[in-house]
Regions:
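Active-site neighborhoods and metal-handling regions in enzymes and metal-associated proteins
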Residues: 1-448
């Protein structure tokens, strides 16, 4: 076990996460890639990219606003524009930014009237900094942008190009501290699944499961519970990707995806359970789901490509979908870092013709799905892993090698009720021969 799990607080007697090293290594990585590119400066509005470059964070409420932005010029330090009070806070508490933390705001996704000139103000600020460094005639890579801001940048004579790929490349290989944070985030979900397993029983609703998981994570120190997919019963196939208020019933399948952030670093972590018991169809589906996941994990090592992995997975037509686009993200892999989905992507839709090489230090999740033969149950499993020099290490540790049955164990007069059984009781009595013509059980029942 090479990847260590530490306590979450800072101590003087053990080096855990070194946040100064984390900040410096992230910034050095994107600076190096920027220097090697044809881009003169990077302009980022996506909060995860802003955090990667500047190590600033003002809460998840701002994630969809595209209002905060940072400029990273060639051979220079990043400049950060933020909400006024946040900018002042950064000056006081983020010494690595100092006076390069400035007040500035975009249009709040169009909430401010165009006549207010906020888009033009953003563009003017960027032009001034580029001119001061002799970069105005160089391309500026932008990761995501509001259209009014894009048009205003172009009006200022700035050539805007795609900056997403450069940022994705920077975030592709994780530093040692990023890996520690990702491992810590997974540790929290291990604990959440343990509580969830004890909690599930008939009558518990999907939304209650979401509430329990969220509380466990926040109590452990989660920064943000991005989502908990809680899917049960006949909702399992096809996968709806959202929880409801449906109550669990005896014999239900139930699968969950827990997505949260610890100091910015995410989890994507599926587990499947049966409530009380599982049908044979469900057991078989789980075994198939686990098998196609395991053959992928076993193949992971540096030098292998995403195409090599995607080829191991069944085609869409083999599990009920007309094509790979229709089945996208069911047999799937994706990088995990400051975002849930980063490079590299593993999918038969794109990877077979456009493979990416797996490298040491990548962190990604592999997830598989298999619908049961009964037409309504299904299994979903996901493991998050770190690529090592000669293979990989899985950092999602809640047991998943076999289908777990949650809830109380039921007992009959003749002993424990089997955990593999059909949800309809009469199907189990028939299977046991109770109703067979001329059987001893039938004769005894008739005489009674």
């Amino acid at each position: 076990m090479a990847i260590k799990t530490y306590g979450l607080m800072g101590v003087d007697w053990e080096e855990r996460v070194n946040y100064e090293r984390l900040r410096n290594e992230r910034l050095a990585r994107i600076k190096k890639l920027l220097k090697e590119s044809e881009i003169g400066a990077l302009l980022c509005f996506d909060m995860t990219n802003v955090r990667y470059i500047t190590a600033t964070h003002i809460g998840t409420w701002a994630m969809d606003k595209l209002a905060r932005f940072t400029l990273l010029p060639q051979d220079d330090e990043p400049i950060m524009w933020d909400f006024g009070s946040a900018a002042r806070h950064h000056q006081l508490y983020c010494p690595w930014l100092g006076e390069r933390s400035r007040a500035g705001i975009s249009t709040l996704r169009g909430a401010m009237l165009p006549a207010a000139g906020r888009a033009e103000d953003v563009a003017r600020k960027i032009r001034i900094e580029l001119e001061a460094r002799g970069l105005l005639n160089e391309p500026v890579g932008v990761d995501a942008v509001e259209l009014p801001v894009l048009f205003a940048l172009q009006e200022e004579g700035i050539k805007v190009v795609d900056g997403q790929q450069l940022m994705q490349q920077a975030r592709l290989i994780k530093t040692q501290d990023e890996i520690t944070l990702l491992n810590s985030a997974c540790m929290m979900v291990d604990a959440a699944y343990d509580e969830l397993y004890r909690f599930m029983k008939p009558g518990v609703r999907e939304n209650e499961c979401v509430g329990l998981v969220s509380k466990v994570l926040y109590d452990l120190g989660s920064e943000h519970v991005e989502g908990v997919n809680a899917i049960s019963g006949e909702r399992c196939s096809p996968h709806p990707h959202v929880f409801s208020d449906r109550a669990l019933r005896p014999g239900d399948p139930a699968y969950f995806d827990i997505l949260h952030s610890y100091n910015g670093y995410r989890t994507c972590y599926y587990r499947t359970f049966a409530v009380g018991s599982a049908s044979q169809a469900m057991v078989d589906a789980y075994k198939r789901c686990r098998y196609i996941l395991d053959i992928a994990i076993d193949a992971i090592k540096p030098g292998v490509t995403t195409a090599d992995i995607a080829k191991l997975w069944p085609k869409a037509e083999e599990f009920g979908f007309p094509n790979e686009e229709a089945a996208f993200a069911l047999q799937y892999g994706h990088g995990v870092g400051l975002s849930i989905w980063e490079k590299p992507i593993f999918s038969r839709l794109v990877s077979l013709d456009h493979p990416e090489v797996i490298e040491e230090g990548m962190v990604f999740a592999l997830e598989t799905f298999w619908p049961a033969s009964d037409g309504w149950t299904a299994a979903r499993i996901e493991e998050q892993l770190v690529v090592t020099k000669d293979g990989c290490e899985v950092i999602t540790r809640f047991p998943a090698e076999d289908l777990l049955v949650a809830g109380v164990r039921y007992y009959t007069a003749s002993g424990p009720l089997p955990t593999t059984r059909e949800t309809q009781s009469q199907l189990n009595t028939r299977a046991n021969g109770y109703l067979a013509e001329g059987s001893k059980d039938q004769e005894a029942l008739l005489q009674a």
